[in-house]
Amino acid sequence: MDAIKKKMQAMKIEKDNALDRADAAEEKVRQITEKLERVEEELRDTQKKMMQTENDLDKAQEDLAAATSQLEEKEKKVQEAEAEVAALNRRMTLLEEELERAEERLKIATEKLEEATHNVDESERVRKVMENGSFQDEERANTIEAQLKEAQMLAEEADRKYDEVARKLAMVEADLERAEERAEAGENKIVELEEELRVVGNNLKSLEVSEEKALQREDSYEEQIRTISSRLKEAETRAEFAERSVQKLQKEVDRLEDELVHEKERYKAISEELDSTFQELSGY
């Protein structure tokens, strides 16, 4: 009987210890589950941030593409303006050369006009002195008069050419000034776009770094989840084992309690039989 009681007490203690271990395992499972939920929540937050970062990255790439396109368009316009300026410079050079030639022709015509005027004055003087001049003098006067008309025509043509060239030169200078203004405006716009492109590029690099860090954090969280899941599975296995041990011990305790009840009943029956025997012996 004492051995059975000691065994039952030992098994109860073992049962209590098993229950404590099961409770501890359940508490650990609960803690691990809570930690896993927190990690999963952090992972969801990180994924949301990554999604936002990817959206920001896409927008930055679109802004970069738009800025690059604008820059290329402005560079194209500046190249066209520079080509126009170069063409106007060539045209102005040609007009300046033409103006120089016109001035040279005007100078020659003026010299001829002065010479013809001088000859006319000389002829007029001679004509007045020699009223009865010869036919040769008259022919000379006609020649000089023809030279005078030619010189006047040349002078008028030179003046007309000079005015035309001067007018064209003024137009070209105005066109050149406007083209230079457009080229300067285009260059200023290119500087602005290059600065904007630099800012967008820096933002893009920052977003790429943020995305890389977010990916690293996601990998770290996934590794933590795998580790915690493994620990959770291990804890659940230990909890199941502890629960099976408790059930097994409970069955053993129940069996021993049944055996104890049976032994008590036998002890009672034997005691009653002994009492009855003693009473019978006492009657004799």
Swiss-Prot record:
Basic and acidic residues composition-biased segments: 116-130
Keywords, comma-separated and alphabetical: Coiled coil, Repeat
Entry annotated with the keyword Repeat: yes
Region (Disordered): 116-140
Keyword Oxidoreductase: no
Coiled-coil region: 1-284
UniProt superkingdom: Eukaryota
Record text on subunit structure and interactions: Homodimer.
Purpose of the protein: Tropomyosin, in association with the troponin complex, plays a central role in the calcium dependent regulation of muscle contraction.
Entry note about domains: The molecule is in a coiled coil structure that is formed by 2 polypeptide chains. The sequence exhibits a prominent seven-residues periodicity.
Family note: Belongs to the tropomyosin family.
PANTHER family per record: TROPOMYOSIN
Name used for this protein in its record: Tropomyosin, muscle
Organism: Trichostrongylus colubriformis
